Design a protein with these regions (language model features):
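Short, well-ordered coil/turn elements that cap or connect secondary structure elements
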Residues: 35, 80-82, 121, 144-145
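Alpha/beta-hydrolase fold catalytic core
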Residues: 2-59, 82-83
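Conserved HGGG/HGGXW glycine-rich cap/lid loop of the alpha/beta-hydrolase fold
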Residues: 46-95
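N-terminal non-catalytic accessory region
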Residues: 26-35, 39-40, 58, 65, ...
Length: 149
């Protein structure tokens, strides 16, 4: 009984925190749903949705598991004045298709490398959150793309 009540309190705390954070993050730009800069591209047999903001050195923003472009809104808003920010919904998340029974880091890494190739980017900077950090590390280890930072 005590454990059940504790779990309920923890759950309510996280729901409250999430609601509070979302209430604070209101932007003029509808990140993750911006028809003026968003588009779909077919990569590795799936439609991947991405948005492209700003000018300058390319910066890939890669969200974590269960998230989407909207979860990177603060970062997009900050970096778009200094970099060309490219942000996508990873396979099976947000507006991007899944088209598989299982999902692996290798598959997601292949998709991000495919997006870099599609955009014909010579060198990139990467900022990844959680699983996005793992994808960025895998891209660096593979050395198929020139990564600055």
């Amino acid at each position: 009984m005590k454990q059940s009540i504790s779990l309920q309190i923890i759950f309510l705390f996280f729901v409250f925190q999430f609601s509070f954070i979302n209430a604070q993050n209101k932007f003029d730009t509808p990140y993750g749903n911006n028809d003026s800069v968003g588009k779909y591209v077919e990569i590795n047999g799936v439609k991947i949705y991405f948005e492209d903001y700003g000018k300058g050195e390319p910066l890939l923003l890669i969200h974590g598991c269960g998230a989407d472009i909207k979860s990177m809104a603060n970062q997009i808003d900050y970096f778009k004045n200094k970099f060309r920010v490219i942000v996508a919904d990873s396979r099976g998340q947000g507006k991007s298709e899944l088209k598989t029974d299982s999902l692996t880091y290798n598959q997601i890494t292949n998709d991000w490398e495919g997006l870099v190739n599609y955009l014909k980017l010579d060198s990139i900077n990467i900022l990844g959150w959680s699983d996005g950090g793992i994808i960025g590390l895998k891209m660096g280890i593979r050395k198929r793309t020139k990564i600055k930072k």
